[in-house]
Amino acid sequence: MEEKELEFAEEWLEVEKYHFKILTIATILADENRAYRGKLSEFCEHIGIQNSSANRTKIKNSLFVLADNDYIRLIIDKDIYTVSLAKSIEKSKNIIKIKKAWYKLIRDNKNTASWENTLKIFLVLLELPNDKAITYEDIGTIVGVKKSTVKNCVATLKKINFKDFVFNIDLERVQLSNGEYRTKGQTYSQMLIFE
C-alpha cells in the first residue's frame, strides 16, 4: 500500500503565517475531501487556534488575500466557506512532496516551535543541496523568521522520530589564519531508512 503524500508549492514558504496555515490545511483537506466546507469557527479548530472574533477575522482576511493571489478558490454562501486549492498549484514547477505521516508527526509534536514554522523549515531542509553549507540566518531569510526560530525548529526536527527518515547535520568549519576555527554554517543531508 502506497503512503499518501502531501504537495507544497515552494512559493508557499514565503507567505505569511496565517496564509501558510490555511494553505497547509487546504492541502490536507484537498487530499481527503477535495475542499474544506464549513464556518470560520470550524476552520479555527482545523488550524489549531482559539475560536475568537480576532482569529476569525484574521482567517477571513487571509482567505481573501490567498484567493486574490490565486492560491485558493473561495466560495462564500452566507457563513459557510468553501476553500479549495487553485489550479495554479498544479502548474507550479517547484513542488515539495512529503509523506502525510511526516506532516502529522510535525503537527502533533508538542514543542516551543510552532508547527507551521517547523513544517516550513522541514520543507526547506528537504530541498537544500547536501554539499552546500547554510546558516540558520540563511534559512530564516528564506521563510521569513528569526534565526532563533530556525534554531528551535531544527532542534525540534532532530527530536522527532520519523522512523523512516533522518536528518544528518554537520558543522562546516574553516581554519582562520591564527589557527582558530570558525563555523561557516551547517550541511543538512537526509537519509531514508529501509527496514
Task: Annotate each language-model stretch with its function.
Residues 1-195:
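Electropositive, intrinsically flexible nucleic-acid-contacting patches
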